Amino acid sequence: MTDPTSIKHQTTLTSGTSADFTQAGEPFALFAEWFAEASKSEPNDPNAMALSTVDADGLPDVRMVLMKGYDADGFVFYSHKASQKGQELAANPKAALLFHWKSLRRQVRIRGLVTPVTDAEADAYFATRPKQAQLGAWASKQSQPLESRFAFEQAIAKVATQYIIGEVPRPPGWSGWRITPVRMEFWHDRPFRLHDRIEFRREAAGQPWTKVRMYP
């Protein structure tokens, strides 16, 4: 095991804009700016985000998912309703997200309420997925035990015979969720761990944001 005391402390600031992000007055515009920069600098998946939910016993779960859209209403991702995350969100529609862009030494933390996307939204996104991914969505019983990789490949092949010609429809148990933030925190690395942290807070969607500077 690596001795954490042997790791050299980072004392220089690397990538990122020189603009003072602490002057931002609204979080979504700032997120858009940071995400655009991350899209240019991250080696892969700048839209990857850690999604945290809580089960019936209050035990948290976290996993990486891909953000598939965002706007002033929130951040959207897709998955199976019967998955562990889907069941936990159905029982407790609150979640936290974390974007970590290592190339920029930045992270964005988000907390908020979760609502399902509309069928029209889910259909539109599903239609953009590669056909093999669409077939996989039909074949997968996400979060359930799987006998073997071969069994999964057989299930995909079986589904494929049903959709040799034409479009693959969205499975009824596959959809998306939108996380509408009530908290958005922007963190940027600074030398000697004297980082910058700005949090935007509001009581509910549609309410005005309050900006607070936080100790690192």
From Swiss-Prot:
Keyword entries, A-Z: Flavoprotein, FMN, Oxidoreductase, Pyridoxine biosynthesis
Residues that coordinate or bind substrate: K68, Y125, R129, R193, L194, H195
Top EC group: oxidoreductase
EC id: 1.4.3.5
Cofactor binding note: Binds 1 FMN per subunit.
Keyword Oxidoreductase: yes
Entry's Gene Ontology molecular function annotations: FMN binding; pyridoxamine phosphate oxidase activity
Gene Ontology biological-process entries: pyridoxine biosynthetic process
Pathway: Cofactor metabolism; pyridoxal 5'-phosphate salvage; pyridoxal 5'-phosphate from pyridoxamine 5'-phosphate: step 1/1; Cofactor metabolism; pyridoxal 5'-phosphate salvage; pyridoxal 5'-phosphate from pyridoxine 5'-phosphate: step 1/1
Cofactor: FMN
Residues involved in FMN binding: R63, M64, V65, L66, M67, K68, Y78, S79, K85, Q107, Q142, S143, W187, R197
Pfam families (UniProt xref): PNP_phzG_C, PNPOx_N
Coiled-coil intervals: none
Function comment: Catalyzes the oxidation of either pyridoxine 5'-phosphate (PNP) or pyridoxamine 5'-phosphate (PMP) into pyridoxal 5'-phosphate (PLP).
Protein name per Swiss-Prot or TrEMBL: Pyridoxine/pyridoxamine 5'-phosphate oxidase
Gene, per the UniProt record: pdxH
